[in-house]
Amino acid sequence: MGCFNSKEAGAGRPKTTTQQQQQATPEPTVTTAEVRADEKISMDQDISQGNVEDFYVVGKELGRGAFSVVREGTRKTTSDKVALKYIEKKFVKKKHIEQLRREIDIMKKVKHENVLSLKEIFESDSHLTLVMELVTGGELFYKIVERGSFTEKGARNVVRQVCAGVEYLHSQGIAHRDLKPENLLCNGEGEDMTIKIADFGLSKIFGTGEALETSCGTPDYVAPEVLTGGSYDNAVDMWSIGVITYILLCGFPPFYASSQNLLFEKILTADYDFPEPEWTHVSEHAKAFIRNLIVKDPDQRHTAKQCLDDLWLSGSDQSIGSAADLHSHFAEKMKKYNDQRRGGQSSNN
């Protein structure tokens, strides 16, 4: 996370992004400098007084990460359900404190129906606990795997909500910088499920006209201007939305290669197509929507507002393709790659 290397990525087609992503995204460098027991990660004015257990009944474990565990919680006074993310401070390296603080600052700032909300924070000598909105439907990635297909109508519903959330984030001066199905959480089932944008670990608050320069994100979804090492802006999020839309509609990514270097070459030239028969039943409106996002020049990319006004998202059902099973024959391959990433991850992790 935060940089790219030259490890080999998976070969072949069609393929989910998971195998490439796991091989291409290095783990953060571990240092010996840890957070002291008396060192605060969050700002004092942000911390709720008392212990989290004084206010919440702690329930079952929902998932586990590298240095965190997520449990279901119930507010004692209201019976409201929440997700309690316990971060064990001794595993948080000093070099990552600012990143964690930035993530908390952003989550405190945002309030939108398509963005995961942070309710309050508790901090003890051993743990930082984030009280978050509970999302029970899991990652969008798993929906793709489990269902094996999205109708164009279902894909459109997902993309519309992602664009609405991103438009809000951009209006608040926030670039997410790591949009992917794993960071899109689902509430409910079927074509009317609600989408929540999550994981702001790589997000950045920027001023009007300010350019960003840090190379970060997940290789399969990263925009060309990030790979070149130059400056970029929030248009990188729109490229990622284009890639996500492409995957939803056919079951495999627009860019695939036998190595990460070859993958980057394809991304840098925006070298992709809409192969048959996978795209036979997908409407031209959907393809045009993608072409306006997966475009090399960021200045030519549609903004989130333009996407919401696009005929594919704003039009009637007549503007979309048939409700045919778009990619059920890719389900088996996706399940295989998904097995590699099952490690107790949580929908709120």
UniProtKB/Swiss-Prot annotation:
GO terms for biological process: signal transduction. Its EC number is 2.7.11.18. Residues 16-33 have a biased composition (Low complexity). The active site is at D178. Residues 56-313 form the Protein kinase domain. Keywords: ATP-binding, Kinase, Nucleotide-binding, Serine/threonine-protein kinase, Transferase. May phosphorylate a specific serine in the N-terminus of a myosin light chain. This is Probable myosin light chain kinase DDB_G0275057. It comes from Dictyostelium discoideum (Social amoeba).
